[in-house]
């Protein structure tokens, strides 16, 4: 008899009855032999890469062709091969613009908007005043722009890099959405697909792997596409996909070793979805160790979340919280027997992390991981305490705690620890205590989760979400609470963009995980992580199952 079966059955538990795994042992079939990259594939990739590099070198920086080429390379998911060249080119484009901006009379909306997005995407502040020439005396965008579909599409994409106070970009967003929606049915198939995908999920708030997978199909159907670029993008995606399949196979074996079904039947079986999150943060070949560590962490977070949220009693959670804070094997005897397997996984996770970091001379990084872990586990207990005492807190009090329970900052700090780069003490302290991007990413995660999971959670005993807190505090309707949550999410994105543009003392590799974590949450439809049988299943299939050479890309 397993330990859960021996737990007192008279205890009332708020069981969530989650569905079984969508994937099961599916990825075990991807053996090392099946997922090995052949020497011919490696050689062909290098040859194509050199040809694309030559295209970048030979195309003048201050030309429309260079902007389009960089944009295409980024969308196809192969920009990571040419980071330095792209960085230098965009710097040159920005410097040339700054030098001549008073003389700049470019009336091509497509070019102005594309340049704006690419320049801001490389963390250079270009003023949104570049768009005033496309407005009338009353500040409204000119109706003649509605004839320029590509211009509207590029302007729409550019608006998602806005910061606080940029009213012209707020107006541009409304203007472009209205007109792109109305004209979409009349467009040719290629342009219609681009508009439809952009309205569904703009580039800036989408994860790069999903952008690449879908754009390969769109680009293939553009008559003027470059065959060499397309071939390179497909081969690169294919090679990375095989690497991801191999990693999923290894992690599935680890998952089976944990004996999930017997030891954690109260929790969601989400190994593959957790790996999807890790890949959304770091997809490149140099981040294998980071993906493995992040996947294990997100698995631990998921099981712990379900333990606190959908199984354990408050009296069981108090000693468990204390044990996690102590992070010592001697705390094992103080917790309920059925909790011990999870606690052991937690201890093993930190032991493994410490050993790996010690090899790299970075053992002191674990200190930051443990600080964030302690904040996180205590915030769970606070939530359980509110539930036990039927407390619906004020919105600000709720957010202070709930932006910790959502675990974004703990994941973010772990990203920095395992990325393989040197991170100074000052950078850790800035990210934890001073940044806008970390709390903004946490808030997006929290509020999006509360919006999409609200109805599902009402089916059982559950702690208050932002929706309940707002309704009670402001005597508002649920619909008004949803509107407020979405407003705060939009503002949080502006905070992320602000740090990305202005926190120039912080390297880009430090900020990108927070940006990608926010993107991962933003793409979720309904309660996709919990009920991953629909949109998320299709997305995972696109990335890790379907061949990029197949005719259908979703």
Swiss-Prot record:
Cofactor binding description: Binds 3 Mg(2+) or Mn(2+) ions per subunit.
Gene Ontology BP annotations: diterpenoid biosynthetic process; terpenoid biosynthetic process
Source organism, top-level taxon: Eukaryota
Sample GO molecular function, one term: magnesium ion binding
Protein family (similarity comment): Belongs to the terpene synthase family. Tpsa subfamily.
Role according to the record: Sesquiterpene synthase involved in the biosynthesis of volatile compounds. Mediates the conversion of (2E,6E)-farnesyl diphosphate ((EE)-FPP) into beta-bisabolene, beta-farnesene, (E)-gamma-bisabolene, beta-acoradiene, selinene and (Z)-alpha-bisabolene. Low or no activity with (2Z,6Z)-farnesyl diphosphate ((ZZ)-FPP). Can act with a low efficiency as a monoterpene synthase with geranyl diphosphate (GPP) as substrate, thus producing beta-myrcene and limonene.
Protein name: Sesquiterpene synthase 14a
Organism: Solanum habrochaites
Lineage: Eukaryota, Viridiplantae, Streptophyta, Embryophyta, Tracheophyta
């Amino acid at each position: 008899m397993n330990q859960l079966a021996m737990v007192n059955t008279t205890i009332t538990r708020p069981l969530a009855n989650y569905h079984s795994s969508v994937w099961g042992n599916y990825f075990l079939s991807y053996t090392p032999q099946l997922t090995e990259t052949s020497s011919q594939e490696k050689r062909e990739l290098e040859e194509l890469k050199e040809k694309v590099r030559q295209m970048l070198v030979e195309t003048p920086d201050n030309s429309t062709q260079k902007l389009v080429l960089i944009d295409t390379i980024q969308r196809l998911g192969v920009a990571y091969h040419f980071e330095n060249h792209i960085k230098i080119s965009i710097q040159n484009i920005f410097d040339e613009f700054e030098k001549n901006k008073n003389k700049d009379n470019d009336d091509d909306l497509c070019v102005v908007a594309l340049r704006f997005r690419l320049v801001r995407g490389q963390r250079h502040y270009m003023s949104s005043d570049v768009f005033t020439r496309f407005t009338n005396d009353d500040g409204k965008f000119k109706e003649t722009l509605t004839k320029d579909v590509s211009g509207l599409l590029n302007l729409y994409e550019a608006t998602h890099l806005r910061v606080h106070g940029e009213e012209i970009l707020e107006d541009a967003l409304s203007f472009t959405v209205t007109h792109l929606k109305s004209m979409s049915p009349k467009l040719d198939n290629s342009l219609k697909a681009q508009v439809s995908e952009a309205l569904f999920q703009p580039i800036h708030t989408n994860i790069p792997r999903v952008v690449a997978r879908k754009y390969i199909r769109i680009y293939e159907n553009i008559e003027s596409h470059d065959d060499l670029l397309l071939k390179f993008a497909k081969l690169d995606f294919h090679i990375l996909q095989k690497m991801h399949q191999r990693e999923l196979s290894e992690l599935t074996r680890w998952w089976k070793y944990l004996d999930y079904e017997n030891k954690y039947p109260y929790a969601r079986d989400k190994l593959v979805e957790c790996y999807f999150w890790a890949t959304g943060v770091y997809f490149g070949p140099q981040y294998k160790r980071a993906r493995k560590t992040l996947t294990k962490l997100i698995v631990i977070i998921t099981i712990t979340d379900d333990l606190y949220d959908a199984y354990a009693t408050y009296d069981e959670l108090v000693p468990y919280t204390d044990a996690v804070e102590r992070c010592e094997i001697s705390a094992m005897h103080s917790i309920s027997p059925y909790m011990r397997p999870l606690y052991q996984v937690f201890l093993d996770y930190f032991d493994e992390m410490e050993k790996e970091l010690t090899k790299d001379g970075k053992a002191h990084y674990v200190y930051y991981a443990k600080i964030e872990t302690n904040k996180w586990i205590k915030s769970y207990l606070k939530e359980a305490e509110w539930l036990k005492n039927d407390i619906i807190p004020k919105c600000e009090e709720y957010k202070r705690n709930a932006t910790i329970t959502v675990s974004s900052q703990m994941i973010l700090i772990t990203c920095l620890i395992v990325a393989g780069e040197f991170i100074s003490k000052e950078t850790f302290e800035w990210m934890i205590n001073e940044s806008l991007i970390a709390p903004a990413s946490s808030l997006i995660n929290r509020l999006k989760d509360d919006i999409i999971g609200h109805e599902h959670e009402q089916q059982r005993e559950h702690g208050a979400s932002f929706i309940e807190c707002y309704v009670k505090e402001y005597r508002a309707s649920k619909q008004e609470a949803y509107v407020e949550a979405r407003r705060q999410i939009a503002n949080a994105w502006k905070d992320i963009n602000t740090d990305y543009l202005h926190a120039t003392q912080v390297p880009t590799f430090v900020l990108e995980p927070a940006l990608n974590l926010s993107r991962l949450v933003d793409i979720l439809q309904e309660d996709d992580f919990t009920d991953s049988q629909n949109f998320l299943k299709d997305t995972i299939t696109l990335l890790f199952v379907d061949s990029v050479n197949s005719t259908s890309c979703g």
